[in-house]
């Protein structure tokens, strides 16, 4: 604490002395006055610290000193970065907490990536993200930190920023310093970036990603636009990752009722259903009005509030009183309940742990915060949201098309259990966006199943599905809430892996499937490269696993035909299976399927060598069999000259068989190479196909609410509108209003 006081007093004394000298000499010489003015500005600019002054010692963070593997503890930096031109840390400034992986597990592309994470609100602290979601740490009920195995810091350096000013540990000098519009917030974030890269110049050349969730769906596109429109700060911005984004408040509000009907939260028979439809109609009328350039309408915001009110359960089906903390649906996770009217505001359950952590003596000082200068940590600040009304800004959905056309990758990932920013609403916004000469996802949209592979047992778990078209990716994350990394931290890293092109593309049950896992597989990474050629079945399990074999046996799929086919294959595979318990599924032929092989060069040569070795082995075995036959012949039956004649005949036969085997092997290998070389070249960006046109969806009218009431049954039992494309059999589309879950994955 004395450090802060001493440093600030010193700065004030120096500034006062410089001002006195400036006043004295300005009467004598203009050049001297200018010189002192420059000295004064230099002195003031010295308030910007060096990087090592922001270093955070793990030993000062409760719990980290007891970490079992200290090598996994990341390098950390934290503190205030001022925003004003004079770098005065006692006016408006942003608080940041940066994590850098030191375990060596990050791939080459990951080591060259810098992620800025922003939470929403507006006015909610990004310490939510740092300590409950994608950050390197989690906090237990005792207020102590422990390592988050699913932290995104292994996919790139990640910086959590409290913004706008007044959020979390970021400060303002007075109420006049609160921002009232997204354009102003964007200017301040660019100022933060300018000073950040001065403090950390080594980060200046890295590819930059803006990531976040919820209201960050507004912040991130606006910040990206501001970065592209200025040339003061050189930022190598490459991608925007937005989780459950609030990108078009009005349009997304129209999908609360359809989503609630689809999920069974309310039915058309409910007495309150017509009341909700009336609110829906009011919102639609506002959108269709001349005021449609407004950022948001109160009539649209009311829909969710009314939905939560009418679905409140005070008594259960037996007439018993429902506990007060179970009466309302959690708007952030429909699987959970909360008290009314909180309806999710008391969630996540880890939230109280953060207050206990930041309240622990010494933690603020460890993060280079002055306890006399910052207030007690609060998750969200009402003043920030009350001031930020955006009178001069439109919703960010109007900005996204230009960013896509500028070449930025935009990835919208959505937890499928969220209500407030649900899948249906986000996909509806996409369907109305126009970019690259098309509207919405085109007919050439690329569709993928998405699974996660456990590093412990290689078990495959369905993670979601992916759509890509013209730089825009939509990812639905199964069994995830509004805060995807909170529920599924390990799975959520697949969002970054997809951007880094660090995924496997395989076929599972004839469907194009992206596999993400816990290991970085980048070309320049230290982690070993996993084999992409694995053919998976048995509900996503490795074909050669014991569990899969038992499953096949129970289904009658592992009968004599498979056995005979296996005996005709490479006998060395069987030996390896016995010794290792399992082997790459690509070595096994199943029902005539060919080995999926991605490695063209060395592996092809190796296959030819294996074929030749097998041929030699077969030839030697045949020689031994012939020798045995000769040796078993009774001596009395050998005629004169017959033995020499048989030897000559056998020698010629052996040579002919050898030549035929080599010729056939070479023909097969050559055919396989030219057939499959394009398919199994080294990994390509799986999501890079240009689109074709799709007709624009007709604009809804005020009659849509009545249509919804009349056709509500269609929402509960949608027709199969699945798009069949290549190996796909049942892929959801926006038109189908399906459950957004792929059956039988």
UniProtKB/Swiss-Prot annotation:
Location of the region described as Disordered in the Swiss-Prot/TrEMBL record: 515-651, 709-745
Cytoplasmic topological domain residue ranges: 677-745
Gene Ontology biological process terms, A to Z: apoptotic process; proteolysis
Topology term for the membrane: Single-pass type I membrane protein
Active-site residues from the entry: 214, 418, 482
Annotated Acidic residues bias: 527-537, 570-579, 587-629
UniProt signal peptide: 1-47
Positions glycosylated per UniProt: 471, 479, 552
EC numbers: 3.4.16.6
Entry keyword Kinase: no
Superkingdom, taxonomy of origin: Eukaryota
Any one of the GO CC terms: trans-Golgi network
TM ranges: 656-676
GO MF terms held by the record: serine-type carboxypeptidase activity
Function: Protease with a carboxypeptidase B-like function involved in the C-terminal processing of the lysine and arginine residues from protein precursors. Promotes cell fusion and is involved in the programmed cell death.
Family indicated by similarity: Belongs to the peptidase S10 family.
Name of the protein in its database record: Pheromone-processing carboxypeptidase KEX1
């Amino acid at each position: 604490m004395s450090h802060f006081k001493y440093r600030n007093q010193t700065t004030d004394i120096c500034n006062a002395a410089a001002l006195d000298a400036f006043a004295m000499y300005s009467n004598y010489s203009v050049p001297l006055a200018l010189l002192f003015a420059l000295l004064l500005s230099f002195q003031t600019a010295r308030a910007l610290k060096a990087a090592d002054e922001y270093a955070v010692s793990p030993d000062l963070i409760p719990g980290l000193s007891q970490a079992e593997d200290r090598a996994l503890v990341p390098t950390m930096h934290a503190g205030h970065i001022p925003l004003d031109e004079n770098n005065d840390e006692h006016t408006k400034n942003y608080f940041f907490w940066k994590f850098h992986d030191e375990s060596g597990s990050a791939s080459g592309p990951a080591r060259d990536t810098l992620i800025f994470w922003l939470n929403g609100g507006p006015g909610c602290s990004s310490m939510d993200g740092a300590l409950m979601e994608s950050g390197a740490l989690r906090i237990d009920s005792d207020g102590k930190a422990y390592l988050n195995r699913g932290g995104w810091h292994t996919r790139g350096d990640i910086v959590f920023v409290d913004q706008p000013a007044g959020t979390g540990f970021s400060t303002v000098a007075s109420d006049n310093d609160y921002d009232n519009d997204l354009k102003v917030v964007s200017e301040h974030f660019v100022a933060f970036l300018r000073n950040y890269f001065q403090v950390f110049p080594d980060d200046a050349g890295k590819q930059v990603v803006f990531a976040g969730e919820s209201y960050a769906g507004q912040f991130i596109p606006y910040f990206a636009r501001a970065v592209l429109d200025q040339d003061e700060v050189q930022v190598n911005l490459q991608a925007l990752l937005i989780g459950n984004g609030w990108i078009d408040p009005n349009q997304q509000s129209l999908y609360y009722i359809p989503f609630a009907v689809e999920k069974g939260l309310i039915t058309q028979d409910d007495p309150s259903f017509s009341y909700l439809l009336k609110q829906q109609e009011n919102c639609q009328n506002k959108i269709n009005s001349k005021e449609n350039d407004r950022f948001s309408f109160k009539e649209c915001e009311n829909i969710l509030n009314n939905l939560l009110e009418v679905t409140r359960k005070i008594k259960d089906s037996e007439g018993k009183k429902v506990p007060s903390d179970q009466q309302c649906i959690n708007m952030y996770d429909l699987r959970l309940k909360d008290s009314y009217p909180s309806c999710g505001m008391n969630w996540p359950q880890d939230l109280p742990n953060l207050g206990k952590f930041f309240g622990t003596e010494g933690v603020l000082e460890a993060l280079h915060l002055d306890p006399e200068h910052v207030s007690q940590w609060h998750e969200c600040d009402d003043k920030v949201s009350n001031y930020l009304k955006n009178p001069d800004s439109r919703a960010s959905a109007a900005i996204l098309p230009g960013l896509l056309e500028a070449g930025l990758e935009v990835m919208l990932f959505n937890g499928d259990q969220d209500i407030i920013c649900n899948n249906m609403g986000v996909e509806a916004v996409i369907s109305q966006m126009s970019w690259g000469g098309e509207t919405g996802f085109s007919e050439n949209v690329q569709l993928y199943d998405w699974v996660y592979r456990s590093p412990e047992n290689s078990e495959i778990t369905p993670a979601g599905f992916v759509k890509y078209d013209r730089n825009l990716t939509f990812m639905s994350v199964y069994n995830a809430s509004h805060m995807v990394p909170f529920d599924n931290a390990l799975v959520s890293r697949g969002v970054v892996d997809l951007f880094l092109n660090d995924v496997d593309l395989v076929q599972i049950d004839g469907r194009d499937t992206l596999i993400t896992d816990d290991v970085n597989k980048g070309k320049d990474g230290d982690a070993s490269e996993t084999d992409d050629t694995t053919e998976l079945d048995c509900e996503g399990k490795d074909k050669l696993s014991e569990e899969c074999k038992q499953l096949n046996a129970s289904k009658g799929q592992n009968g004599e035909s498979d056995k005979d086919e296996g005996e005709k294959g490479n006998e060395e595979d069987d030996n390896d299976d016995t010794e290792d318990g399992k082997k790459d599924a690509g070595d096994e032929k199943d029902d005539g399927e060919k080995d999926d092989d991605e490695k063209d060069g060395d592996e092809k040569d190796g296959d030819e060598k294996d074929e030749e070795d097998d041929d030699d082995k077969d030839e030697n075995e045949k020689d031994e069999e012939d020798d045995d036959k000769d040796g078993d012949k009774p001596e009395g039956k050998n005629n004169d000259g017959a033995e020499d004649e048989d030897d000559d005949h056998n020698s010629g036969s052996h040579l002919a068989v050898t030549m035929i085997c080599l010729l056939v092997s070479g023909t097969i290998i050559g055919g396989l190479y030219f057939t499959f070389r394009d398919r199994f070249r080294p990994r390509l960006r799986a999501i890079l196909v240009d689109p074709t046109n799709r007709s624009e969806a007709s604009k809804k009218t005020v009659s849509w609410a009545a249509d919804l009431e009349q056709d509500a049954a269609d929402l509960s039992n949608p027709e199969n509108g699945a798009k069949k494309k290549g190996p796909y059999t049942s892929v959801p589309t926006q038109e189908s209003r399906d459950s957004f879950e792929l059956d039988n994955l």
